[in-house]
């Protein structure tokens, strides 16, 4: 509902804000809406009381205004709704009317709800406690829901584990069954062997059958011979009959007797033959019976084998069914798991929904805050759901990958099977080659024996040679070790020399030694640099020599390794010597490496020594705490080198020193007041000069507006801040005035800096400058103060001289008049100096104490700012004119800066010269800077003392202060306008500089802005780590330097690297090309080269470690090493997280959130102004730092200058001795005042500030160290990832392992990136709810400005600054323009802007403002006291009763001091209590962090153990899968062998059938012979009976016998052919089985068999008459038709006839016409079961019926044939007539035989339509095993994911509890501190008013 109000309505003519004054809800990055974005006409914004500042309270008037505005808006909305309804009724009168009405009603409801929410906004403050209780209750509910979900998940896990155990048991049972099956296969193998032996016996029996056939052939021949003899006898009989008929009757008796004898002989012969034949027949029958018995035994064995195979098939089917049931159970488990996951998600979502509904109800009743918290919780849970969804998607992807891998594995399995077959073939070939190899081995043995003899001879000669070589190498090694030791000594000596030189440098850093010996230091530095460079060159040469030597040693190592391999077995002494040589070589390499390490360590020491020389300056320049600013003189000690006790002692000493300084300061103030009373007469004149100066500065400022460009405006803005810093340095300089020191050093610097070309022209100027230098070195301030007319004259003369120098040509520089006038002025000043030294000598007694002008400058800071601004304006105009006259001169890197910045940094550096150790290090300028800069410097130096004098003598009149305030306000307004323009120019300038830096880098190929950013980042990331070496702590000042530069223009780079490694970014756009000169690029490239060296070292180490492995074992070892490295990195990350959490907690409490709320409340102009002032401050500080670090060159120092300096020092010493005598007298008088003001030290207030600053610096140092470590780790991780990718490309690794390891590496890299971002920007996750949408919107709208987002100096949120109202800002600018940058305002702007807790931010802001108020109140008290003192002095002048007034003033002062002391003590005790409580809280937080880290480590150990267990389980599963695969392969091979045996048995059965047919034919032949014999006997009887009658009726039986004999011959020929074809087919089958191509040839063989049978039967049918066999002629078409239906090649392609084919093959012979039959196909759904090795048959029911009919018909035919044979053999048929009864049964018998054969052929054809099946097949068994493995893998993966998710839930719950606890503690502590500080503020505001009711104190900020 809130979102609908933000969008515009399409139906409205304009937006809602257009007519009613309502504004849409602004983006929530503005937490507090300003007045301009309020509710229309200046009404106060609606905000919670938490967000209102404590100083601002809302009245009833504000609420009334708000209510009236709401009423107006309500009325406007009603009118608008009315008109809209009318318009909608007019325009949309159709069916869409109700939709628009509903839309309008919803909008009305939305607006009403908004109004209700706004009205309930005030109740939020009252309901905060209820919200906390609700939040705690909600947390408990969430915990309860999580615990329920956890219990459910545990139950699911237990169920899953139980199911997994059951499945494992089932798998074990299946394995046992498989083992049983394997034992069964072994028994089958034994049976198969026995069958093969029996088959061999059968073959032998077949050879016996061949002998039988030979015997039968011989009998056939005998039969034919007998037939021929019968024919001859028949011919004889006929002849005899003829003769008998011819012979007469008398001869009949004789012929009959002969005939009787012949017949008797014939009968005897026939009887003998018959007996012999009967014997043979009986013998054959016995043989046939024996063969039949053998056949029956074999059939029994085959039947038993079939039964066993059926049992095995059943067992396999049972196993497959069990496996299918297991698969179903696994699927059910998966479905249960899915349901449980869905239930868990629903159970998580349901309580969340209920909670949301409850919170909505409570929200409508109570407040909106609870809803916000619940929405945050919902967002977290939603993010968790999103992460879980992503994990599920990733799991699905993994599952897909696993399936793909399984498919690949299957393909590989097939390929491996093929390879196995090929290996079998190769094994056969290898068996052949074994014999050849054995022969070759014998030959080789002989050769080896010969070679061994030769080697023994050679070995005898080798020891002498090796010993000589060894001695020579020992000498070389000794020489190398001696040279290495010498170089080590040289290195140690050089190190000692460097250390001595550095110690000397450190000891020489005192003031007097530097004054007297600056040229000696320069020469020492030059002499140190030259031997360093020589040493570096010599070291490089030695390093190259060592590399050559190491290369030679590596070659020698290879040679010796080869020798060691040859001599391993024979000579052990040589091996020991070689090992010694290798050990020596390793020692030498270690020495070389140690030398290199020493070299690098020396370089690091040198760099650290240089840094130590530089670090005091950086520490001083960027120290941000109040105490460090007050005590800049004592910055020579560094906190990091001391222990805690030493630091405490130092702090106590510093506090004592500050007290002494304060007391001396008060005493000096008193004396200065007395002296100022004496010089009252000159004050009137000074007022007029001051006002004239102010007018001049105003005029100069007006001219600046029109003349100077944008860059000069920016520089003028810099000058304001620089002048403040000058005043600060001046205030802290003690009795030695800052401008005097500056003038002195400037003269010294520029005296030697001018070019030698103008030496003649400038000789007079040099003399003048030396005079002025002596004048200023004598500290001529009192004379200048008393003589302002002299100052004005000197300034005018200098101005005149500079103008003349600018107008004239470069050769006309010297004007004699002006020079003479300047000399006269200098002489006058020197004369007056001698007179004024005695009167003003007291100011030089305590040169270390602060001058009273420090306090005056604090009081009148704004007036001084205006005056100094006018000075800077004048110098700018002058320098612009000089820039126009000399454009042709060349500048170096320092010339790129504007002259004003140079001047200001010079002033600051001179202020720094007051520190011990830096007094004589005067800054040097390059020769390119001209004398014009010197003159402008002199002018300003002459103008600043005059200005300060005016400020010092200014009376405290309210009118002048008001005028000055008005002028300052006008100037500030103009500055704001200029700064807006400067911002735009700065943005362009920074982008151009980044582009130029990207072009300057040689490695960056594309010149675009993101590339430049990347180059800059990578260039400076490695620098801090290299500077610090292996140290873990840095100087606190360097950290603050980094943090202070976060406000500079180049924000990103200064966050990473310290600014002394960067070239300064210029403020002027014109000098950009000059800025990017060779020196700046050199410094940039130097830092980058150091980084690249470090990275290359890591890369080379990584590349040297990578040797491409050939085997997987080496790869596994590599992966293991990488995993150990990963563990190490994870431990490092854990430690870094500890440090980061500690540091974040401290930073957020101390200073992390000061500026975010302030920047939101502040107007934009003030934010811009403070940002620019911060940037200019840090730029100036950096310039100062760089100039201090720049070494002095020997050209600057001149001999004359040194002599003049020495003379001046001698004179000053004499004067100091005089002054010290006077000071001893004055010391007793001043001692009483010192005791009075001793207790007013501000150090007591600032001790806490100092401790906080020190803690902050240490914490930020830790963050910086951890960031450097993160950078190094991230680089190392990237190199590791590259190396791992190269490993994967170089060798074959398991893709799953590689993917897992790659994911781990990427996760580690992501963690390191997150840590880097965290250390750079702080917490980015806990942003306010609006920041994500805001970022998305900005990314969409500002895609073109992507480079600016990285380079612009302004952050998206306003910068951290003091949040005060406009009045407070103005008063703050008038009263307390402190030059010191507050440590809290500069630290961590990004963390401060991103901290989400508004309440915490407001409390911390209040703490800061209260601390400010406290400091300001102390300062105002001091100011009031000073005013009282001054008024007392003024009244003392006019009054005579001085002692009475002074006593009263003394009493009031003492009472005030006592009161302030008590108040300060109370405040200090409160602050100590607060600090102790904070320390306790910090200790508690640390303890909780330690516990958390311990729990994390424990969890990591558990995770490692679980991972190891999972890996072990995976290995076990893989081994089991391999075993299962092996078993399945063995089962498949055994089944194939069984099928082959069965096929062989089938072939044997066919042979037996053929033999049965032969036996039947033989039986038939025997029966025929018997019949022939019987008929022959009958014929003989008939012939006897008809011998007398002579009938001729015996021809019919003979003719029938001839036909029968022909048929028998045809049958015999057919049987012989079939036997021959069977033998050939058998031989072919054996060959094909041996070759393994049986499957391809089966179809062809069956076709050949059918073709042969068809040809045989066709021949038979052609030979016979149609009349003799009518049934055969009818069924002949069926026979030919059967040839067209070809047999399939394999059982899987076994055909099934269609309906038409079945009809054509039916029993009805008439319907079986020659219809074309197509190739049949398998029955749908059954071909999956078809296999060769199946033990079941499958067919269509039609085919089965047809086969049944054929078999029944055949049975009937056989029964008829049996009847016919019985009738033929019965004695009744023999008794009947033989002629008629013989021919008819024989023809019937033959026709029935033919039909029986046709029936058998049809039956065989129908049998071919049956095919073998097995349910289920072996392939499915293997698939089932694979599926079980997949399911197990999925179950284990799901188990792991559940475990990981549970761990994540537990960790998040713990983190939530800990964060809530921490927030509660912080909130309680902040409430306590808030109350304490509020009491303190009340005390501070009430007490001064009670103490001074009459005095008018200035308005305080925040009042």
From Swiss-Prot:
Ranges for region Required for centrosomal attachment, Golgi localization and CALM1 interaction = 1736-1903, 1871-1880
Q: Which parts of this chain are annotated as the region CM1 motif? A: 51-94
**Maturation and modification:** Phosphorylated in vitro by CDK5.
Q: How does it assemble?
A: Homodimer. Interacts with CDK5R1 (p35 form). CDK5RAP1, CDK5RAP2 and CDK5RAP3 show competitive binding to CDK5R1. May form a complex with CDK5R1 and CDK5. Interacts with pericentrin/PCNT; the interaction is leading to centrosomal and Golgi localization of CDK5RAP2 and PCNT. Interacts with AKAP9; the interaction targets CDK5RAP2 and AKAP9 to Golgi apparatus. Interacts with TUBG1; the interaction is leading to the centrosomal localization of CDK5RAP2 and TUBG1. Interacts with TUBGCP3. Interacts with CALM1. Interacts with CDC20.
Q: What is the organism lineage in this UniProt record?
A: Eukaryota, Metazoa, Chordata, Craniata, Vertebrata
Phosphoserine-modified residues are where? 485, 544, 1241, 1243, 1495, 1673, 1676, 1903
Broad class of the protein's primary localization: cytoplasm
**One Gene Ontology term of the molecular function aspect:** tubulin binding
In which compartments does the protein localize?
A: Cytoplasm, Cytoskeleton, Microtubule organizing center, Centrosome; Golgi apparatus; Cytoplasm
This protein is called what? CDK5 regulatory subunit-associated protein 2
